[in-house]
């Protein structure tokens, strides 16, 4: 499994958590029955668990940049994509350009026609306001 596939799995797990509120350990267990994450296991677990631990903070950032979109009106898959990407940039030491590009590609694959532009715009505004540059990450 490569990092792109692992990131898709993270988004799927965050989506599953949002719609089911199953314990994250159960969600991880169910996904691992499907496919062995191999070298990406640490990234997957750190990102899923970290995004859930920081869910309130991440959701405040999403609300701040969503231009009058309430979280409960957004497609759940878009929320999962945004949560993954913001977590990566804020806490996961992932370069901004990689995280945004991957988020947009995942949106093209799994979400609505308008979602890639929405996600790109929201994440771009987040990066500008956080003072992150292309290729950088926040080293929290």
UniProtKB/Swiss-Prot annotation:
Q: What are the alphabetically sorted keywords of the record?
A: RNA-binding, Transcription, Transcription antitermination, Transcription regulation
Give the record's GO CC terms.
Answer: cytosol
Gene Ontology BP annotations: DNA-templated transcription termination; transcription antitermination
Q: Please list the disulfide bridges.
A: none
GO MF, one term, reads:
RNA binding
- Superkingdom of this protein's organism: Bacteria
**What Pfam families does this protein map onto?**
NusB
Q: Which Gene3D superfamilies match?
A: NusB-like
Keyword Oxidoreductase present in the record's keywords: the answer is: no
Q: Which InterPro entries match?
A: NusB-like_sf (IPR035926), NusB_fam (IPR011605), NusB_RsmB_TIM44 (IPR006027)
Tell me, in a sentence or two, what this protein's role is: Involved in transcription antitermination. Required for transcription of ribosomal RNA (rRNA) genes. Binds specifically to the boxA antiterminator sequence of the ribosomal RNA (rrn) operons.
Q: Which HAMAP family match?
A: NusB (MF_00073)
Its family remark reads: Belongs to the NusB family.
This protein is called what? Transcription antitermination protein NusB
Name its species: Thermoanaerobacter pseudethanolicus (strain ATCC 33223 / 39E) (Clostridium thermohydrosulfuricum)
Q: Which gene encodes it?
A: nusB
